[in-house]
């Protein structure tokens, strides 16, 4: 009776260890080749610290639930175990599926992961490692690149591009924040900058008005210039015709039209305008008197404001 009770107690104490042995036996039965035997020999490569085999770690998973150091050691062993298999497509491999089935059952029993959905086992394992790193603040050095790059859809390389894209976006965000903060600090340090810019605009207003007057004068004089340009060839041909028919006749002393070299004929409208208007003494432009100069009017309030401000 004592032997029977002892045997029954041992059966109750080590159920997960027997499950781990059954897992290894199933893996050996499914892959009885020499290549797999060589892989089984190097399932757990030697680490710098003393490492327990993976089934033994899986058996004691309930003890690692509250101890960060033991949990870190366990995750390192699991990652090393999966990396040592050197499988090109872990999502469709039988060994990986069996291992994650067992891992999912153990994690679900400990309350770490809920739901043994086989289509998301790889994603659940990645989330477990990320949550562990964030909770303790010290990321473990793990070789998880084959698992992180593995996708259920073949030919999908977006997982390799996402980290680089996220890194570039983070750098651009930091640069934009730095530039904006620098501009904001400059604006706070120099609050009179806006007032100076407004004052500069008010000081330049007379010059702008003078330029507008010059442009308006050019546009107003353009039809007269065009009219004189059209009359010049006719006058030149008329003079040449008179010289051919009467070369010996002396020129008249007084004529209605007298042209010099390089001088355009003066139309009656232009002559009347020159007689009536004088140059402005303020902006040196014609077409208005000094008392009506817009530049003088715009500069006068600015001068009075500056004297009052001083």
Curated annotation (Swiss-Prot):
* GO MF annotations, alphabetized: nucleic acid binding; zinc ion binding
> Example GO biological process term?
norepinephrine metabolic process
Q: Does the keyword Ion transport apply?
A: no
Q: What keywords sit in the KW lines?
A: Metal-binding, Zinc, Zinc-finger
Q: Where are the zinc fingers (CCHC-type)?
A: 278-295
Q: Among its keywords, does the record have Metal-binding?
A: yes
Report the function annotation for this chain: Involved in cognitive function in the brain, possibly via the noradrenergic system.
Additional notes on this entry: RTL4 is one of at least 11 genes called Mar or Mart related to long terminal repeat retrotransposons. They do not correspond to functional retrotransposons, but rather to neofunctionalized retrotransposons genes.
Q: What is this protein called?
A: Retrotransposon Gag-like protein 4
Gene that encodes the chain: RTL4
